[in-house]
Amino acid sequence: MPELPEVETSRRGIEPHLVGNILHYAIVRNSKLRWPVSEKIKTLLDEPILSVKRRAKYLLIELNQGWIIVHLGMSGSVRILPEEQPEEKHDHIDLVFRDGKVLRYTDPRRFGAWLWCEDLATSSVLAHLGPEPLSAQFNAQYLYQQSKNKKIAIKPWLMDNKLVVGVGNIYANEALFSSGIMPDRKASSLTEQECDVLVNAIKTVLTRSIEQGGTTLKDFLQSDGKPGYFAQELFVYGRKDKACLICGHTIESIKQGQRSTFFCRHCQHGEITD
């Protein structure tokens, strides 16, 4: 699933091609995504693109009339292509621009979304989101205050968008490894010092992934069609039964909330004793 670094990589890739350009028209080949494609998108004609932003894992494309809100779902990606490029099986949406370029949305599993909103303040999908992880608002004091009396395990807690947005499974695993914190500890067990280390680890791993164009494990492609290269820098995610790159001990895995969690008993400390 594309997480925050992949969405931010996509935003940075498409922004120079969209902002200041004129959306000539939209082609919707398949409306059956996670939610039906908003009818308004199908009717857009000759609309200038004012900005391309990101909130959590949503791409926000600003036009005079409102906003296109894009979620990449489990397997979605957006690419900039020439208008004459033939569409393929899973190419569901094109935004065709006056300069002959196309923003093409590809989504094999169709769990993504293309929504329309006149005012972001009224958008139900953007309501109740926590702070951005790379913002000053997300800091050790905030995380420590939020952790008090929380009996939930740390890793699924970090993945709650009401706490902080965009820390998906890959990056939660990697940040906890970097912090030396076991993923099944209760959130309430975190000390102020551990919160400081953990916040810094989250910011570092997300920033590094963005610099590498995100993580491609299967479907994700950058806007130029290239994969993300952060997969080559993963310490624990997807490395069950392999040697830890730091200490040589075996990487183990458990299930937390139907998600795979990866850890090293030697480098991380906390609850797991089996």
UniProtKB/Swiss-Prot annotation:
The active site is at P2, E3, K57, R259. DNA binds at H90, R109, K150. Its EC number is 3.2.2.23, 4.2.99.18. Pfam families: Fapy_DNA_glyco (PF01149), H2TH (PF06831), zf-FPG_IleRS (PF06827). GO terms for molecular function: 8-oxo-7,8-dihydroguanine DNA N-glycosylase activity; class I DNA-(apurinic or apyrimidinic site) endonuclease activity; damaged DNA binding; zinc ion binding. Its cofactor is Zn(2+). A zinc finger (FPG-type) spans 235-269. It catalyses: Hydrolysis of DNA containing ring-opened 7-methylguanine residues, releasing 2,6-diamino-4-hydroxy-5-(N-methyl)formamidopyrimidine; 2'-deoxyribonucleotide-(2'-deoxyribose 5'-phosphate)-2'-deoxyribonucleotide-DNA = a 3'-end 2'-deoxyribonucleotide-(2,3-dehydro-2,3-deoxyribose 5'-phosphate)-DNA + a 5'-end 5'-phospho-2'-deoxyribonucleoside-DNA + H(+). Keywords: DNA damage, DNA repair, DNA-binding, Glycosidase, Hydrolase, Lyase, Metal-binding, Multifunctional enzyme, Zinc, Zinc-finger. Binds 1 zinc ion per subunit. GO terms for biological process: base-excision repair. Involved in base excision repair of DNA damaged by oxidation or by mutagenic agents. Acts as a DNA glycosylase that recognizes and removes damaged bases. Has a preference for oxidized purines, such as 7,8-dihydro-8-oxoguanine (8-oxoG). Has AP (apurinic/apyrimidinic) lyase activity and introduces nicks in the DNA strand. Cleaves the DNA backbone by beta-delta elimination to generate a single-strand break at the site of the removed base with both 3'- and 5'-phosphates. HAMAP family: Fapy_DNA_glycosyl (MF_00103). Belongs to the FPG family. Monomer. This is Formamidopyrimidine-DNA glycosylase. It comes from Proteus mirabilis (strain HI4320).
